[in-house]
Amino acid sequence: MNTPLSPVSGRLASLDILRGFDLFLLVFFQPVFVALGQRLNFPWLNDILYQFDHESWIGFRFWDLVMPLFLFMTGASMPFSFSKFKNAPNKWHIYRKIIKRFVLLFIFGMIVQGNLLGLNPDSLYLYSNTLQAIATGYLIAAIILLHCSFRYQVLITLLLLLLYWIPMTFFGDFTPGGNFAEKVDRLVLGQFRD
């Protein structure tokens, strides 16, 4: 099924609806639904509420889809927004947009969850938020999208998946404190991590 672009804005309607649904879950539905469920204390509702929190370590819940869905939507919208710049001889205009978006998302992430406005280095977290993950993924994907053919985009994607899978599988263990990603976080970010 093809989802038409809006004739007024040129935006993909299905992507905007999905973005709205994800924001609705994050900002309204989950907080209100959880507060209501705690107030009413219905046993059948507790089973549903269980899905609106993250799993502590191993497992999967519905709420674990919210952040990856934002990353997916960012990536899905990039070919539409970058198509007019792909073959442009001077890409400086799009680079300015990419850098501006990266910096803004990163700073907003530090404000929201990184305690940036607290101005206390002991409680400052440099990389602790979905917005920062979106910013970093956006920057990397933008560079790949603007400079690589579709064939190389697929190849780079497969290589990145492999480069992530190998250390996660063969180095460290599968405990919260012993997995490879946790070790890299401790090494690179040190005290500035959430």
Question: PLM features: residue spans?
Answer:
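Transmembrane alpha-helical segments and their boundary/interface "anchor" motifs
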Residues: 64-69, 84-113, 117, 122-162
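Hydrophobic core segments of alpha-helical transmembrane domains in multi-pass membrane transport
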Residues: 23-31, 141, 160-168
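Short, motif-level signal for alpha-helix interfacial/capping segments enriched in acidic residues
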Residues: 1-2, 112
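Membrane-interface interhelical loops and short amphipathic "cap" helices
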Residues: 37-60, 115-128, 175-194
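N-terminal signal-anchor module of multipass membrane proteins
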Residues: 2-90
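Transmembrane helix-loop junctions in multipass membrane proteins, especially transporters and channels
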Residues: 34, 38, 42, 84-89, ...
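Residue-level marker of positions within ordered structural domains that often coincide
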Residues: 32, 80, 145, 149, ...
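Long hydrophobic alpha-helical segments that form multi-pass transmembrane helix bundles
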Residues: 150-194
